[in-house]
Amino acid sequence: MNKLIASAVIMFSSHTVSALELLVPAYFYPVDDGVTYWQTLADAAPDVAITAILNPDSGPGAAFDSDYAAVANAFQAAGGRLIGYVYTGYGARSEALVKAEIDRYYAQYGVDGIFLDEVSNLAQHLGYYQSLHAYIKGGFERNHIVANPGTQTPEAWLATADVLVTFESPAAEYAGYAPDPWTAAQDATRFAHLVYDVADADAMRTIIDTARAHNVGHVYVTDDRGDNPWDTLPTYWAAETAYAAAVPEPSAWAGFVAGLALLVARLRRRPR
């Protein structure tokens, strides 16, 4: 039995299927359409678990922005979780600068946690991210941490965040994604996938089903693409929130996992 099939079987037998949470990179400025997108997030928050990533200027920005504060406060009041974007330069950015931006997010926007971007998965940088983890967890009461390497990491990275983003790429690359075996034994809430350039609602549902099969508890799927695929909400947003919030019937879920395993087995048997 190949590695992916084994992982799928383990994940199905070991984990309860539940509603997914949406992790939304809300990289739209709150004017014109941007205000509408933020209001759409707030409107959905009572019905589906949403974590929105606040990103005024590749970080909190040099000065407080009242437009961002207004939409952020409304989103939180509706029940959404708000986390602030900070880039780490793959472990090369000064810890002092990163910590200063973390401080500004809490002081200016009252965030519920931090989104660490450009996260290295190299062993020599583990201590860097453990230090940031300790700083956030020790310094703030609301201290949810999402770390985004955008790819696989060693298991030790679980100590750096509450959620690891282990995939951030276009849909064309998702079909070939195979999770590391160690992830199967973890709770699905520890992992997130961000998938863009997903053409329509049917393709979105397939992506979400696949994320479930990979033991992923947080997901975001969009038809946006280009240099910044996170500057709009998907045209199928309503369908996505409904599908993420729904809990699949056990029989249907078992059938999907079995079908995924069969497909992988057939692909692996093709002559090269």
Model-derived regions, located:
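A short, hydrophobic C-terminal helix/tail in secreted or cell-surface proteins
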Residues: P248-R266
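Hydrophobic aliphatic residue packing
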Residues: V9, V247-P248
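Glycan-processing catalytic domains of CAZymes
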Residues: S18-A246
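N-terminal signal peptide c-region/cleavage motif recognized by signal peptidases
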Residues: S13-T16
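Small-residue packing motifs within transmembrane alpha-helices
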Residues: K3, I10, A254-V257
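Hydrophobic alpha-helical membrane-insertion segments
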Residues: L126, A171, A258-L260, R268
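Residue-level detector of intrinsically disordered, flexible termini
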Residues: I5-S7, S18, S251
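Positively charged n-region of N-terminal signal peptides that target proteins for export
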Residues: M1-L4, E249, R268-R272
